[in-house]
Curated annotation (Swiss-Prot):
The keyword Transcription regulation does not apply. The modification Phosphothreonine is found at T199. Belongs to the heat shock protein 70 family. The gene is dnaK. Residues 602-627 are annotated as: Disordered. GO terms for molecular function: ATP binding; ATP-dependent protein folding chaperone; unfolded protein binding. Induction: By stress conditions e.g. heat shock. The keyword Lipoprotein does not apply. This is Chaperone protein DnaK. Gene3D superfamilies: 1.20.1270.10, 3.30.420.40, Actin, Chain A, domain 4 (3.90.640.10), Substrate Binding Domain Of DNAk, Chain A, domain 1 (2.60.34.10).
Length: 641
């Protein structure tokens, strides 16, 4: 039975894990690392790189190297957070026809899900290489504070990558699973503080033993889907650019290559400042003007960096306060605080968390891997490999519809355990109204306009009646993936209409299907490209070997034989320049046949040299050899006695 893998699709890095022998295992990628950069590069020749290879070429291809795209998934172009990112990213963020935030690659608009699909495809391949079998099913994690359209867009990305997404689970919940699965410490409430590359979540979770079963119940969740390590990097980038501008009067923000180098340097400096009190950013030849090349050399202390990001760390505390209030607990009720996400390695973040909760955060959970491990455990639960685990997650935001006067009427309150279902009866606002529009909303504001619109649908053919008389029953149904299905039914006629909220990724079902097919086609294309490269390498090796033999032993061949081999070499070299695998293999075989005579000459010469060496060997040496052999034989005989 094929395994269900667990994938942490992160903003900055991604990770994949699988259950083996009842234990979760994080899988190393082709580069030998346990996490993979969530970076995708689109090259001139059409090749798509994902992970470390994409990151390595980012400096020379900044406009077509996409990172932190998860921050755009399911978002509108006009949102202030998206507008802020436009000025920071070296690639182009553009407005889709439906008003969503898309990206532009090589002059073409692209929705975020296909880009995320490339990262998922890389994780899928990593798992397949390790397991030695095809992987088609996965549990994928998302930030707990992702709204419905962001969850749908993540599911779409999985489909495009050739994965059936068995479950979408929240990152803090996954981390709690990773932490609590083997703990036998009795009932306890834990806080999962998850500050990743692009998003922040806080979840209050109760772990309980009920009839021998590990129950993980999410009491509340809160967060900020536009707060993460990328924002910390951007503060450092701005600081470095400002320092350079003060000294050299040149703004590096206008130079895409320089901006990309600053991004790499800022990330490196941030990591170093978690263990060192000071670091130096040294970027020679960062730019040039009429007076010549310019170099950037800036020293940064940990204290300076902390002052640059103080407000960002503070921003994470408000959601913690709200989450505790919603769960009905005090900081002193929390037994353990778990840190998740690479940014939690920053000492100042740990200090702030300790100050708020009044206790040291746990250090026995790997912040980069815990989420993928939890996803793999959930995969094991779904597959039946992990028993006695019950996961009770919640919906992060309230759900409702727009009613008379532009008010949002909530049907499902935030932090309701899922799956769940709720119904409410509404009526018409006008006499003889024959249709109603159901506007589905998500958020906490009282007025509809202040909340996120997830979609709308109509219920028509309502029989004429005075206002307030018809009874329209609206039902909200949230599945285990926290994805919403809405229906409206006229109780008098039984007429019903329903909608599954689709992702705000601007991708229709047809487009997603086409992308799935493209992915399968690309897999075949990749295989063919690999075979072509192997054929070229084999041919190149053959040419090198024959040329070497020809230079050493060519004088022993007849002129005609030598010319024939040289002509065959030229044929292979010409074939290598093309893309015809069969032609390369045919020419390589022809060269092999043509050089057969040469091979025979080389072999004969080697035999002759070997024979001559044996004859020339002094008699004394032969005697020594004989003695050695006899001695070995005698030793064996002695052992047997």
């Amino acid at each position: 039975m094929a395994k269900i893998i667990g994938i942490d699709l992160g903003t900055t890095n991604s990770c994949v894990a699988v259950m083996e022998g009842g234990k979760p295992r994080v899988i190393e990628n082709a580069e030998g690392t346990r996490t993979t950069p969530s970076i995708v590069a689109y090259q001139d020749d059409g090749e798509i790189l994902a992970g470390a290879p994409a990151k390595r070429q980012a400096v020379t291809n900044p406009k077509n190297t996409l990172y932190a795209v998860k921050r755009l998934i399911g978002r509108r172009f006009e949102e202030k957070e998206v507008q802020k990112d436009i000025g920071l990213m070296p690639y182009t963020i553009t407005k889709a026809d439906n008003g969503d935030a898309w990206v532009e690659v090589r002059g073409q608009k692209m929705a975020p899900p296909p880009n995320s699909a490339e990262v998922l495809r890389k994780m899928k391949k990593t798992a397949e290489d390790y397991l030695g079998e095809e992987v088609t099913e996965a549990v994928i994690t998302v930030p707990a504070y992702f709204n419905d359209s962001q969850r749908q867009a993540t599911k779409d990305a999985g489909r495009i990558a050739g994965l059936e997404v068995k479950r979408i689970i929240n990152e803090p919940t996954a981390a709690a699973l990773a932490f609590g699965l083997d703990k036998q410490e009795g009932d306890r409430k834990i806080a999962v503080y998850d500050l990743g590359g692009g998003t922040f979540d806080i979840s209050i979770i109760e772990i309980a033993e009920i009839d021998g079963e590990h129950q993980f119940e999410v009491l509340s969740t809160n967060g900020d889907t536009f707060l993460g390590g990328e924002d910390f990097d951007n503060r450092l980038i701005d600081f470095l650019a400002d320092e350079f501008k003060k000294e050299k009067r040149l703004d590096l923000r206008n130079d895409l290559l320089a901006k990309q180098r600053l991004k790499e340097a800022a990330e490196k400096a941030k990591i170093e400042l978690s263990s060192a009190q000071q670091t130096e950013v040294n970027l020679p030849y960062i730019t040039a003007d009429a007076t010549g090349p310019k170099h950037l050399v800036v020293k940064i202390t940990r204290t300076k960096f902390e002052s640059l990001v103080e407000d960002l760390i503070e921003r994470s505390i408000k959601p913690c306060e709200v989450a505790l209030k919603d769960a009905g607990v005090k900081p002193s009720d929390i037994q353990d605080v778990i840190l998740v996400g690479g940014q939690t390695r920053m000492p100042k973040v740990q200090e702030k968390v300790k100050e708020f909760f009044g206790k040291e955060p746990r250090k026995d959970v790997n912040p980069d891997e815990a989420v993928a491990v939890g996803a793999a455990i959930q995969g094991g639960v779904l597959q039946g490999d992990v028993k006695d685990v019950l996961l009770l997650d919640v919906t992060p935001l309230s759900l409702g519809i727009e009613t008379l006067g532009g008010v949002m009427t909530k049907l499902i309150k935030k932090n309701t355990t899922i799956p769940t279902k709720a119904s409410q009866v509404f009526s018409t606002a006008e006499d003889n109204q024959n249709a109603v529009t159901i506007q589905v909303l998500q958020g906490e504001r009282e007025m509809a306009a202040g909340n996120k619109s997830l979609g709308q649908f109509n219920l028509s053919d309502i029989p004429p009646a005075p206002r307030g008389m018809p009874q329209i029953e609206v039902t909200f149904d949230i599945d285990a993936n926290a994805i919403l299905h809405v229906s409206a039914k006229d109780k008098a006629t039984g007429k019903e209409n329903k909608i599954t909220i689709k992702a705000n990724s601007g991708l229709s079902e047809e487009e997603i299907k086409r992308m799935e097919e493209d992915a399968a086609a690309y897999a075949d294309e990749d295989r063919k490209l690999r075979e072509l490269v192997d054929a070229r390498n084999s041919a190149d090796g053959m040419v090198h070997s024959v040329k070497k033999s020809l230079s050493e032993h060519g004088d022993k061949l007849e002129a005609g034989e030598k010319e024939k081999i040289e002509a065959a070499i030229k044929d292979v070299e010409d074939a290598i320049k093309g893309d015809d695998k069969e032609a390369i293999e045919a020419k390589t075989n022809a060269l092999m046949e043509a050089s057969q005579k040469l091979g025979e000459k080389v072999y004969a010469e080697q035999q002759a040299q070997q024979g001559g060496a044996e004859e020339a060997q002094p008699q004394g040496e032969k005697t020594v050899d004989a003695d050695v052999v006899d001695a070995e034989f005698e030793e064996v005989k002695d052992d047997k006695k």
